């Protein structure tokens, strides 16, 4: 047969091997379709580890190796991270809080420790500044605020949103870097009014606020660096969609055993109620 076809025996066997490795069956086509849908829903940001977990959640029992092969077969390329400028201004004469957190990033319950930070996103109109408040328990973004200026009201509004949504009790630790906005009198008074405990990273040590830094890395890697925002309003709408729809509700978080923050909190609430 090989002589009739005009091909070598090794070429024929190589073709047969490739054909066997790519089965044209219903289950395989369903798997590929699921991979493509997951990749699209996460804006092509999931690597093979998260893809495996997402497929497992849909009752497809695949390994990470299998997930990688399916992604390759589907032609899916994952977006990669860039570096970004630091926005913290720690060079100020304002008083700072002691570091109460000390890199203890694991907590037992919601609304026990919040971490806060500011970043900037470029638009054709200029910089847009984003302040967030994250609950350490579930890594959920519980408060945020955006503005064209990096002023004290930016961080106060983000914390007020978290207070309004979550009603955290007195004694909550609120950690941030040493930026002047977090050291301001208005912000300190806000903490005092609700009986919260202020905490700040050590000077020049970004790892003390690693959870907030990690969120900003995900936001920019998975969304902002692939966009060309014409206006601040367009950026605000896109960031809002990322936080409220994708990150809190859908994105699989490795720290949460590949659950979304909302799913993790819901399961924790059920466990507490059943206890």
Task: Report each predicted region and the residues it spans.
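Charged DNA-binding/catalytic regions of mobile-element recombinases
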Residues: 1-275
């Amino acid at each position: 047969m090989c002589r009739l076809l005009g091909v070598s025996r090794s070429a024929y066997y190589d073709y047969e091997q490739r054909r066997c490795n790519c089965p044209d069956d219903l289950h395989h086509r369903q798997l590929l379709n699921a991979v493509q849908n997951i990749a699209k829903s996460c804006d092509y940001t999931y690597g093979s580890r998260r893809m495996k977990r997402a497929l497992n959640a849909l009752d497809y029992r695949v390994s990470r190796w299998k997930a990688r092969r399916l992604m390759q077969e589907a032609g899916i390329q994952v977006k990669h991270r860039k570096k970004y400028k630091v926005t913290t201004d720690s060079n100020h004469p304002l008083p700072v809080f002691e570091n109460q957190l000390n890199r203890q990033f694991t907590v037992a319950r919601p609304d026990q420790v919040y971490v806060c930070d500011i970043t900037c996103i470029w638009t054709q109109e200029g910089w847009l500044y984003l302040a967030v408040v994250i609950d350490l328990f579930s890594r959920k973004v519980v408060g945020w605020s955006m503005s064209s200026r990096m002023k004290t009201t930016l961080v106060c509004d983000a914390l007020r949103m978290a207070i309004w949504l979550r009603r955290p009790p007195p004694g909550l630790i609120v950690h941030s870097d040493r930026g002047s906005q977090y050291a301001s009198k208005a912000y300190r008074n806000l903490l005092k009014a609700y009986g919260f405990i202020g905490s700040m990273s050590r000077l020049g040590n970004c790892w003390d606020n690693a959870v907030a830094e990690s969120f900003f890395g995900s936001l920019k890697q998975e969304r902002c660096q692939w966009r060309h925002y014409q206006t601040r309003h367009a950026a605000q709408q896109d960031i809002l969609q990322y936080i409220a729809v994708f990150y809190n509700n859908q994105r699989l978080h490795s720290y949460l055993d590949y659950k979304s923050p909302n799913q993790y909190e819901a399961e924790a609430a059920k466990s507490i109620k059943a206890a």
